[in-house]
């Protein structure tokens, strides 16, 4: 497990974006080899998405051969509703990059058979070869996706009833009107995310400090579903200083002492421009008479 501690939200967002960029470029995706990326919604990943868009616009990164799978979607909310996760992803990320729409996968909360939709989503992940890197965020109660406290740590994609704390937290997106807030959602399971070859979890802000403490300093507990990722062989937690307020001083000191090593994951920062130059140079035949 790696814990990356940056000073501020913007730095944490940039580190995460650099990591995703390097992972995609090092994977060297192509027509017969897609990079599969799991993605979250919410305010936490917005800074990361903005940096990824910047990398694309600068010509340093392409999503042409990337397939994405989103974590969740509300049940009963029209796809074009401004607060649907379809709208969120298209407005904040997908429409700004070169990803093909057919390569984006978001659960359909209006499907006639919701469980069949969840089962099909799992099959699509398998057909894509599994998730290479699953990026996630958490709530103050430690839930990941909509795996609320008490969720099974081996759960799969399913229909989930939302906890009242989540409904109250989401009311701000629905004019503060609890009656407008969806009470159910489709969500990947903890087990679904655990199946990814690598997991990166973004945790920022003092309001999530206790959840981070539960995630890494205490034992695995289904009341704090994010704690399950202690047992994943390749978990990266990316956080800002505020999120570390509940951690022991020695824990923070230990992981900060590893930053010189961990920063090598994003430095050097790779670019598809460099890859294209290397490719063109290697394809040139030596001069001969």
UniProtKB/Swiss-Prot annotation:
Residues with PTM Phosphothreonine: 161
GO CC aspect terms: cytoplasm
GO-annotated molecular function: glucosamine-6-phosphate deaminase activity; identical protein binding; isomerase activity
Record field: catalytic activity: alpha-D-glucosamine 6-phosphate + H2O = beta-D-fructose 6-phosphate + NH4(+)
Gene Ontology BP terms: carbohydrate metabolic process; glucosamine catabolic process; N-acetylglucosamine catabolic process; N-acetylneuraminate catabolic process; UDP-N-acetylglucosamine biosynthetic process
Modified residues (N6-acetyllysine): 64
EC number: 3.5.99.6
Keywords assigned: Acetylation, Carbohydrate metabolism, Cytoplasm, Hydrolase, Isomerase, Phosphoprotein
Pathway: Nucleotide-sugar biosynthesis; UDP-N-acetyl-alpha-D-glucosamine biosynthesis; alpha-D-glucosamine 6-phosphate from D-fructose 6-phosphate: step 1/1
Activity regulation remarks: Allosterically activated by N-acetylglucosamine-6-phosphate (GlcNAc6P).
SUPFAM superfamilies according to UniProt: NagB/RpiA/CoA transferase-like (SSF100950)
Chief site of localization: cytoplasm
Active site, UniProt feature: 72 (proton acceptor), 141 (for ring-opening step), 143 (proton acceptor), 148 (for ring-opening step)
Stated family: Belongs to the glucosamine/galactosamine-6-phosphate isomerase family.
Subunit (UniProt): Homohexamer.
HAMAP family, A to Z: GlcN6P_deamin
Described function: Catalyzes the reversible conversion of alpha-D-glucosamine 6-phosphate (GlcN-6P) into beta-D-fructose 6-phosphate (Fru-6P) and ammonium ion, a regulatory reaction step in de novo uridine diphosphate-N-acetyl-alpha-D-glucosamine (UDP-GlcNAc) biosynthesis via hexosamine pathway. Deamination is coupled to aldo-keto isomerization mediating the metabolic flux from UDP-GlcNAc toward Fru-6P. At high ammonium level can drive amination and isomerization of Fru-6P toward hexosamines and UDP-GlcNAc synthesis.
NCBIfam families linked to this entry: nagB (TIGR00502)
Protein name according to UniProt: Glucosamine-6-phosphate deaminase 1
Species this chain originates from: Bos taurus (Bovine)
